[in-house]
A protein has these predicted regions:
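A Rossmann-like FAD-binding core segment of flavoenzymes
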Residues: 2-49, 62, 72-81, 108-166
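Conserved acidic residues
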Residues: 37, 59, 89
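Short glycine-rich loop/turn motifs that provide flexible caps or phosphate-binding loops at active sites
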Residues: 41-43, 54, 63, 94-96
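A short, gly/pro- and small-residue-rich
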Residues: 52-69
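Short secondary-structure boundary/capping segments
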Residues: 53, 82-84
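Beta1/beta-strand and adjacent pyrophosphate-binding region of the FAD-binding site
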Residues: 85-97
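N-terminal Rossmann-fold NAD(P) dinucleotide-binding loop
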Residues: 100-101
């Protein structure tokens, strides 16, 4: 419901949404540039990247898109069977990007016993080194509102396998 409200607000402000377009196939790139002052290509993904590691098949290991939608449905007042909740659990989130951050925050808000976030990359510096990174995206430590809620973060972690008893 929140996303629907935001989209309606943006439509009312003049934003035009065209989804499932293949630029260069069913939409001409030159026509886009000629007709619009700004074009946003936002290629999000609902398809996860799996970790081909021993033990991956254990119960309790889930993709973000199997976990996050349940909370959105609950927030919208929907009741859905077989919901995944982090309440009372020790949660590890593998991945330090925006989706990982969403999983961290959702787990904390659901009352997880603990939340640890593993990031493959080494911890970047707090301050960016502009001469080193410009014109690329600056390498500096970013702390999302989800991380501010209390997750432990570990950097330079390579997932080699999973162990457990289902």
């Amino acid at each position: 419901h929140h996303i629907d409200r935001r989209m309606e607000q943006m439509r009312a402000e003049g934003v035009e949404f065209r989804v499932n377009q293949h630029v260069g196939v069913n939409v001409d790139a030159k026509k886009l540039l000629a007709e619009f002052d700004a074009v946003v290509l936002s290629g999000g993904s609902e398809y996860p990247r799996d970790i081909p590691a021993p033990g991956r098949e254990l119960k309790g290991i889930h993709f973000a898109m199997d976990f996050l939608p349940w909370q959105n449905k609950k927030n919208a007042g929907d009741t859905v069977a077989n919901q995944l909740f982090a309440t009372g659990k020790n949660v590890v989130v593998i991945g330090g990007g925006d989706t990982g951050s969403d999983c961290v925050g959702t787990s904390i808000r659901q009352g997880a016993k603990s939340v640890t976030n593993f990031e493959l990359m080494s911890q970047p510096p707090v301050e960016e080194n502009k001469p080193l990174t410009w014109p690329n995206w600056p390498m500096k430590l970013r702390i999302s509102s989800s991380h501010e809620e209390g997750a432990k973060r570990e950097f330079s972690v390579v997932t080699k396998g999973f162990t457990g008893k289902d």
